[in-house]
A protein has these predicted regions:
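Gram-negative outer-membrane beta-barrel transporters
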Residues: 598-605, 620-717, 751, 780
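Membrane-embedded beta-barrel scaffold of Gram-negative outer-membrane proteins
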Residues: 329-343, 347-353, 545, 574-658
Length: 781
């Protein structure tokens, strides 16, 4: 998973202030107000200290928590050809210091510090893994590692990450096929020019155990190696039976550290084994039925947080990821750099997990829960090659900073499921209760209250012969340019063209004495996407921008491993296109530009969404709209006090959700406009906010705390089931024992609040961990 951090020619790699991401207030008035508030601080920063313009400033904190929040001046993505301050997009960089201070141990942990991102849950067609939504749009396929798309459903780790970059808004000009919400770029650790060893050893409640190591060694003037290791084993606070363990290794070597030609070879391996969480079913919004819980209000059922509806001797999840990368670059001088990256990756996601399904209504009518078995056997492989040329030149008296590139990739997903013998997986009807005990019931149901996870569910598990293979081939060319007309005015433009082909094949198979014919589907789309942004700089440490961009989501966008799959209904349709507008501002204030403020107002429109048309066929006739505001802050008030946070408001509306069947008249199916027109996007809170701050009390003691707020989140477009709003508090304290050892205590969910953090299925909600306390020894030498 690792490769050399990439930056445009002449890029500055590190600086002590952070770019931020949170965009803006409603319209021009609020934007002007924000700028007015920031102006005095900005002017003070200019007169007091020119450090905000220094070419390279590296800050070393004096305490174990690395209290000074650090982030690069430029993105590690070489497609962003301007410093982050002058990039006309909302970009959030989560630096290593914030990841460490908050006690994050997974990608989803780290992303909770970024408002506007929500975590979805797995369901029948959607795999268990990192199901992410950005600005209301599904971004499941929009995760990249050092600029290369990372395919396959995974639960990603952070032990090998230097930082995490979140680009919000249309992402297709940068990454190809994608959603309108944005993308996530994971920046890997790579060999450095100094020797160091960093290690962590942590213990906590819920049987938490974790250890990591990060070792860098300089072999010669031009060669260095780096090795990252991780072991993790833990249960989940407040939840019965659920546990998981994983381990990973990530070595890398760089040749030519001080040469014009540099090559980095890296390998990443991570595998995990767990008993996955089942969550809690929703209370169906019925007007009748037994009042066994909060009858019919659409929230998750009112049972103890520890309630587990799964089966210990049936449920499991095993994953494995292997990624190898060769990154070669040559510096011709005069800021001209040629780079080529070749990567091969393979991942597997194999599971049986219990979805506490409420679709039959038995939860409310009879007080029983169907233990629906969601299963998957998936292997995904991908090979990609990316070549880019970046540099600077003068033309017509204007300075150009550009990147040109070519990308080729092939992705293949093989997906199947499990068959259980004996057993039916759907014994329920809407009119009869579901037996919950006795061998003849096969234990496919459980009582709503006090289910027995150790029910003796006996079966033989085999892989279904119905195996789907999806192959996706993509060819892309792109170009980006930042044109500096004057020191105050810049224009950022970019365009990308993609040739996208995807095929689905299901060979003929026989199951239960029934033969199913082979199925073959194909889609071929070409699409161009662009982005353009005009930047005005009131001062050297501020910018105001307006930008416009597009994105395309073709049929089969998920590559065969998600909900946006290829089917006969969509294979002949055009890509869904989104157009987005953003007005924002960024300021680096206080001496040295050590505190970053940002704000933006944005609007995204999709006017050819795939929905059911009046004739019952799927067509590109639907429409969606998201309007929103983001605010962000990151950096340091003083050398002792750091901060990282933001706020996002999203008004996400399904304007035209197509048509629904209303019955059959004279043999003809009748359709009417969807009753869900005008509803809020599912998995999209209207308001979300996050704030983390740390303060160094003495050279040896640092304390910190965080607050996360997420508004009500609907589980489906029907808007009748939802996870309630919640506020979570976290705390941290660290103590420097010696020059080499620091102890850090993290308490997450300080008040032990019961809340639900994963919702994207209308059947159940994911239960967040209860109060979790961990004590970690950070060792450096």
């Amino acid at each position: 998973m690792k490769q050399k951090n990439s930056a445009p020619a002449g890029a500055i790699q590190s600086r002590k202030h952070t770019p931020s991401s949170a965009p803006r207030l409603h319209g021009g008035t609020a934007l002007a107000a924000f700028a007015t508030l920031a102006m005095p601080l900005a002017l003070h920063a200019q007169t007091a200290d020119k450090a905000s313009q220094l070419p390279e400033v590296k800050v070393t904190a004096t305490t174990s928590t690395e209290r000074l929040v650090q982030a690069p001046v430029r993105s590690a993505n070489d497609k962003l050809t301007a410093p982050l301050l002058d990039t006309p997009k909302s970009v959030t960089v989560i630096p290593a210091e914030i990841i460490a201070q908050t006690g994050a141990v997974s990608l989803t942990d780290a992303l909770r510090t970024v408002p506007g991102i929500t975590i979805g849950a797995g369901e029948g067609g959607n795999p268990v893994g990192d199901n992410l939504f950005i600005r209301g749009y599904n971004a499941q396929t929009d995760t990249y590692i050092d600029g290369i798309r990372d395919t396959g459903s995974q639960s990603r780790e952070i032990f090998d990450l230097e930082q995490i970059e979140v680009i919000k808004g249309p992402n297709s000009a940068y990454g190809g096929r994608s959603s309108a919400g944005g993308g996530i770029n994971l920046i890997s650790k790579s060999p450095k020019t100094e020797n160091f060893t960093n290690a962590t050893v942590g213990l906590g409640n819920a049987k938490y155990r974790r250890a990591t190591a990060d070792v860098n060694r300089v072999i010669s003037d031009d060669v260095a190696v780096r090795l990252n290791l991780m072991f993790h084993d833990a249960h989940v606070a407040g939840r019965d039976f659920i546990h998981g363990d994983r381990w990973g290794i990530a070595p890398s070597i760089t040749f030519g550290l001080k040469s014009a030609t540099q090559a980095t070879l890296s390998y990443y391996h991570m595998q995990s084994s767990e008993l996955p969480d089942t969550g809690l079913p929703f209370n169906n919004p019925f007007s009748s039925g037994a009042n066994v819980a909060k009858n019919g209000n659409g929230t998750p059922v009112d049972v103890p947080r520890s309630t587990f509806y799964g089966l210990v001797n049936r449920d499991f999840r095993d994953t494995k990821t292997d990624i190898g990368t060769i990154d070669v670059r040559h510096d011709f001088g005069n800021n001209l750099v040629l780079r080529n990256v070749t990567r091969y990756g393979k991942s597997g996601n194999d599971y049986v997990w219990t979805q506490p399904d409420d679709s039959k209504g038995n939860t409310m009518l009879y007080g029983t829960v169907w233990r629906r078995a969601n299963t998957r056997v998936t292997d995904t492989s991908a090979v990609a090659n990316a070549t880019s040329l970046g540099g600077e030149f003068l033309a017509g008296g204007f300075k150009h900073t550009y990147t040109l590139g070519l990308e080729l990739s092939r992705e293949e997903t093989n997906r199947s499921s499990y068959i259980f013998t004996p057993g039916t997986n759907n014994p329920l009807t809407k009119t009869f209760t579901c037996p919950t005990s006795g061998a003849t019931t096969l234990y496919n149901c459980a009582p709503l209250i006090n289910p027995n996870a150790n029910d003796p569910w006996v079966y033989t598990r085999t892989v279904s012969p119905a195996r789907t293979t999806v192959v996706t081939n993509t060819r892309s060319v792109y170009g980006f340019d930042t044109i500096e007309f004057t020191p105050q005015w810049l224009l950022n433009v970019g365009i990308r063209w993609d040739d996208y082909k995807s095929s689905l094949n299901v060979p003929q198979y026989t199951l239960n004495n029934t033969t199913t014919a082979a199925s073959n589907l194909n889609v071929h789309s070409t699409f161009a996407n662009y982005q353009a942004g005009l930047v005005y700089k009131p001062s050297t440490n501020s910018s105001v921008y307006i930008s416009y961009g597009t994105s395309s989501t073709p049929p089969g966008n998920d590559g065969g491993d998600g909900l946006d799959g290829l089917s006969a209904a969509v294979q002949n349709l055009q890509p869904q296109d989104s157009k987005s507008f953003e007005l924002g501002t960024k300021w680096e204030v206080l001496p040295g530009g050590r505190l970053s403020l940002s704000g933006a107002y944005f609007q995204s429109d999709m006017n050819n969404a795939r929905v059911t048309a009046p004739d019952g066929n799927t067509q590109n006739v639907g429409s969606k709209q998201v309007k929103g505001v983001e605010l962000g802050i990151s950096g340091n008030f003083t050398k002792e006090w750091s901060v990282f946070g933001g706020y996002t408001h999203l008004n996400a509306v399904v304007e035209n959700n197509g048509f629904v069947s209303t019955g059959v008249v004279n043999g003809v199916t009748q359709y009417a406009p969807s009753p869900y027109n005008g509803n809020q996007f599912p998995t999209t809170p209207k308001n979300s906010a996050s704030l983390w701050t740390a303060y160094t009390v003495t050279p040896a003691i640092t304390i910190g705390g965080g607050i996360n707020y997420v508004d009500k989140v609907y589980a489906s477009v029907a808007n009748n089931k939802f996870a309630p709003a919640y506020t979570r508090f976290d705390a941290m304290a660290s103590y420097v024992l010696s020059r080499n050892v620091t102890l850090q205590l993290n308490i997450q969910n300080l008040t032990d609040k019961l809340y639900f953090d994963k919702v994207s299925s209308p059947h159940y909600a994911g239960v967040a961990p209860g109060r979790t306390a961990t004590l970690t020894a950070n060792i450096k030498f």
